């Protein structure tokens, strides 16, 4: 789900997950 995806993105990029979604 989006929550798990967001956590993965945060761990991989070290950025705020919201920025990866363009939010």
Swiss-Prot record:
Required cofactor names: Ca(2+)
Tissue: Expressed by the venom gland.
UniProt record, GO biological process: lipid catabolic process
Keyword Disulfide bond assigned: yes
Subcellular locations according to the entry: Secreted
Predominant location category: secreted
GO MF entry, a single one: toxin activity
PTM (free text): Contains 7 disulfide bonds.
EC number(s) given by UniProt: 3.1.1.4
A GO cellular component annotation in the UniProt record: extracellular region
Cofactor note: Binds 1 Ca(2+) ion.
Keywords: Calcium, Disulfide bond, Hydrolase, Lipid degradation, Lipid metabolism, Metal-binding, Secreted, Toxin
Catalytic activity: a 1,2-diacyl-sn-glycero-3-phosphocholine + H2O = a 1-acyl-sn-glycero-3-phosphocholine + a fatty acid + H(+)
Organism superkingdom: Eukaryota
UniProt function note: Snake venom phospholipase A2 (PLA2) that induces local edema a few hours after injection (5-10 ug) in the hind paw. PLA2 catalyzes the calcium-dependent hydrolysis of the 2-acyl groups in 3-sn-phosphoglycerides.
Family per similarity comment: Belongs to the phospholipase A2 family. Group II subfamily.
Protein name in the entry: Basic phospholipase A2 CTs-G6
Organism of this sequence: Trimeresurus stejnegeri
High-level lineage: Eukaryota, Metazoa, Chordata, Craniata, Vertebrata
